[in-house]
Amino acid sequence: MAKLTKDELIEAFKEMTLIELSEFVKEFEEVFDVTAAAPVAVAAAGAAGGEAAAAEEKDEFDVVLEDAGAKKIGVIKAVRELVSGLGLKEAKELVEGAPKAILEGANKDDAEAAKAKLEEAGAKVTLK
């Protein structure tokens, strides 16, 4: 296998999407047992700055159904599609018992896709 130079690697990274780069970094971390997170400096970091950094590093999200809205049937169908093995009765109880977590510990892409699907069905959803 030919060895790539740093410049060739940079050019290859420029052609990748952010999602592809994110997946690359995760796989790189697993293969080489390293982490790309920079050490956090404890001194003089403002509370707002610390919260923003924590939000950027978050990789697991909970999709919380806040309100089903007027189109409950569509929301129930969307919940059944998102949560495997959920029957009609369970999905209805979940939707009517809002606010409830629909997905817990989902990655960012799955959480955003679930949020979009539920909002399209008429629900009010938050990611935590």
Swiss-Prot record:
InterPro entries in UniProt: Ribosomal_bL12, Ribosomal_bL12_C, Ribosomal_bL12_C/ClpS-like, Ribosomal_bL12_oligo, Ribosomal_bL12_oligo_N_sf
Keywords, alphabetical: Ribonucleoprotein, Ribosomal protein
Keyword Glycosyltransferase in annotation: no
Top-level taxon in the UniProt lineage: Bacteria
SUPFAM superfamilies: ClpS-like, Ribosomal protein L7/12, oligomerisation (N-terminal) domain
GO molecular function terms listed in the Swiss-Prot or TrEMBL record: mRNA binding; structural constituent of ribosome
Gene Ontology CC annotations of this record: cytosolic large ribosomal subunit
Pfam family, one: Ribosomal_L12_N
Ribonucleoprotein is among the record's keywords: yes
Alphabetical GO biological process terms: translation
PANTHER family, alphabetized: 39S RIBOSOMAL PROTEIN L12, LARGE RIBOSOMAL SUBUNIT PROTEIN BL12M
Family stated for the protein in its record: Belongs to the bacterial ribosomal protein bL12 family.
Assembly notes: Homodimer. Part of the ribosomal stalk of the 50S ribosomal subunit. Forms a multimeric L10(L12)X complex, where L10 forms an elongated spine to which 2 to 4 L12 dimers bind in a sequential fashion. Binds GTP-bound translation factors.
Function of the molecule: Forms part of the ribosomal stalk which helps the ribosome interact with GTP-bound translation factors. Is thus essential for accurate translation.
Name of the protein in question: Large ribosomal subunit protein bL12
Organism of this sequence: Corynebacterium glutamicum (strain ATCC 13032 / DSM 20300 / JCM 1318 / BCRC 11384 / CCUG 27702 / LMG 3730 / NBRC 12168 / NCIMB 10025 / NRRL B-2784 / 534)
Classification of source organism: Bacteria, Bacillati, Actinomycetota, Actinomycetes, Mycobacteriales
